[in-house]
Amino acid sequence: MFHALSSEVMGDGKERISGYDPLNYPENNRERRLLVLNKLLELGDISQEERDEAVADNVYERIAQNHTAAETGEIYSYFEDALIYQVVGDLVNIRGCTEEEAWNLLFRGGLTVYSTQDSELQRICETEVNREDWYTSDAQVSVVLMDPYTGQVKAIVGGRGEKGGSLTLNRAVSSVRQPGSTIKVVGEYAAALERGAVTLGTVFDDAPYSYQNGDPIRNANGSYGGRTTVRKAIVNSINVVALKSFHEVGLDTVFAQLQEFGFSNLTEEDRVEALALGGTHNGVTNLELTTAYSAIANEGTYLPPSYYTKVVDREGRILLSKTPVDHQAVRSVTAALLTEAMESVMAEGTGVNAAFSGMALAGKSGTTSEMKDVWFVGYSPYYCCGVWGGYDDFSAQSSGSYVKSIWRAVMQQAHQGLAYRSFEGTESLMPAVICTKCGELAVEGLCDATVQDNMTQTEYFVAGTEPAESCSCHVAYTYCEESGQIAGNYCVLSGKVSQVYLVQGTEGTADAEAVAPEDDTVCQMHQSWWNVLFPEGEGTQEWEDTPPPAHEDEEQPAERPGRDDRYWWNDWFRF
């Protein structure tokens, strides 16, 4: 609960007499205040009810509390800053106050604000942001921790180090930064999965590729993996596949999808291909990004962030009630697919260093050029958390691993004592074992035994979108171990070895070396049964047309009809 500074202390409007100071001389001020209130009633400027209400208000106790806070140097937290701005904004937009009236009402109107903050989670976030062990530089950081099912913000930290004052720069809410690869999930992948343009098993060729203006696009690791599923592209943050997915649905569709996820800082200047990889004119805030990922955790339902549940006046009347209006950013099955993929990010991809055991987790990393901005945003069945790191002046960084360390530390502590939960919605998806090089149904003994290793994956699909055809991209060859050539019918005793290759692969990618050799010559060493029985050339001596002459006095054997002693088999088969 947040108690705002409340009620105005009456004065004469012109003079400031020390003897009437409400802090040091409250009794004198109370008498003066009664005189003024009675005069206002006499003149008809206030009603009897308003006069009595003002008299009953114990404003002096609140003044003493606020003065004590000022003397002790108490400064509002980043959460309280954000809360104040939201309440003032709602007083203007919902209650119709002017901005000046809203500020006066909040700080002098006796209001009580019921906040969504969890003080223990706020303490955890502040502690971890300021833990020096995570850093090798003096980069700045922001953290947002939300309940994705209500939209309620539980904790916010808008900067690292000692907070210099109240209502100062809050990097979690106000700073717009380039989102890097975190935008892919809520941009092109969400848009393409939502519209059925791709599945998690759809395969794109991760090969040299260019923007429409001819500029080449490169992956972070500087290499190309060849045929790659959408899932693997999300897990390993592959830029080429992201841009190809972007092109599947088009710029306008992706832009509209991002608007559905609440990114309000996007402008018409952001309608460019670079948006696919997080290249924006202004950028996004941590609050926007964390809220967007919260929508995925909430089965596709977007809830705007809130810092309070209600605001009441001194009489207990509700002035503001925060009941967020939700909308469906994506279907629940689309959210389930994205969650499925981002669970793999945590298990085997770029989120491994942010993961911890004992809870279902999904998340995505993001890094811009020269690591000017580094991100990790992810969620559990309980909370969604976003961590940003970088310099206020956009300087380059040498490392960005600290955002994952902070995310893990915050989320691990936030989940202490909470029962394990799995993500809801994924149970409606249909599993199928696919070949990851073509996206079709895997063939046992073929796709799981290739020269590139096991190329099968249990993938999940919206019912009706799973593949129906079997793998068409792999071919098996059996080789003679002796000759190294394709085994023929007569290589039965020499030993054979099978190799499974790709039918084709793009040059310059990892697939190029996995394509079947062009030499399809059948074994030249074993061309007949003769070669089977005499693999080293035994029994292959040519006999002359006539047998050698016998000695003159040697008795000649009687000639048998049908027998020809010139051939070796006559020694085996007697007629």
Positions of predicted regions on the chain:
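Active-site SXXK
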Residues: L35, L40, C125, G151, ...
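Beta-lactamase-like hydrolase cores
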Residues: N104, S119-D147, R231-I234, H247-E248
